Swiss-Prot record:
Amino acids binding ATP: K12, F60, R88, T94, R105, N115
Organism name: Homo sapiens
Residues forming coiled coils: none
Cited InterPro entries: NDK-like_dom, NDK-like_dom_sf, Nucleoside_diP_kinase, Nucleoside_diP_kinase_AS
EC number per UniProt: 2.7.4.6
Protein name, as recorded: Nucleoside diphosphate kinase A
Gene3D superfamilies for the chain: Nucleoside diphosphate kinase-like domain
Leftover remarks: The role of this protein in tumor development and progression is uncertain. This protein is found in reduced amount in some tumor cells of high metastatic potential. However, increased NME1 levels correlate with aggressive tumor features in neuroblastoma. May have distinct if not opposite roles in different tumors.
């Protein structure tokens, strides 16, 4: 299948605390993407600083790391055709106020500082983030019985 790729999706502490984990997983499954990695974890400050290294000079960096370290997160790897681009569309805009209804942030968020979910913004970012959060042996390669009903 052309353009079959993987993306990193993380449900942030506010999404976990609000009980939205199942709803978010449901949306990705119903779209037809395949879950190949999942962790429920308390991310270390070091991991978070490395994950957000591109934002280290921004004034909100320390607050972002503190927020992401404030509770458990759900780290996931999803696989499918154009999953990075489509996943970003499903998430909505970084600022929930700019997100359309029907997107995760458009349906469940109000403020940018509590936008419940992270998604890789490119295939290259996805590869980096997946390598940061998962060891290769933690990713499961399998064939879904639904695959022939989703892809031509």
């Amino acid at each position: 299948m052309a353009n079959c790729e993987r993306t990193f999706i993380a449900i942030k502490p506010d999404g976990v605390q609000r009980g939205l984990v199942g709803e978010i997983i449901k949306r990705f499954e119903q779209k037809g993407f395949r879950l190949v990695g999942l962790k429920f974890m308390q991310a270390s400050e070091d991991l978070l600083k490395e994950h957000y290294v591109d934002l280290k000079d921004r004034p909100f960096f320390a607050g972002l790391v503190k927020y992401m370290h404030s509770g458990p997160v759900v780290a996931m790897v999803w696989e499918g055709l154009n999953v990075v681009k489509t996943g970003r569309v499903m998430l909505g805009e970084t600022n929930p106020a700019d997100s359309k209804p029907g997107t995760i942030r458009g349906d469940f968020c109000i403020q940018v500082g509590r936008n419940i979910i992270h998604g890789s913004d490119s295939v290259e970012s996805a590869e980096k983030e997946i390598g940061l959060w998962f060891h290769p042996e933690e990713l499961v390669d399998y064939t879904s019985c639904a695959q022939n009903w989703i892809y031509e």
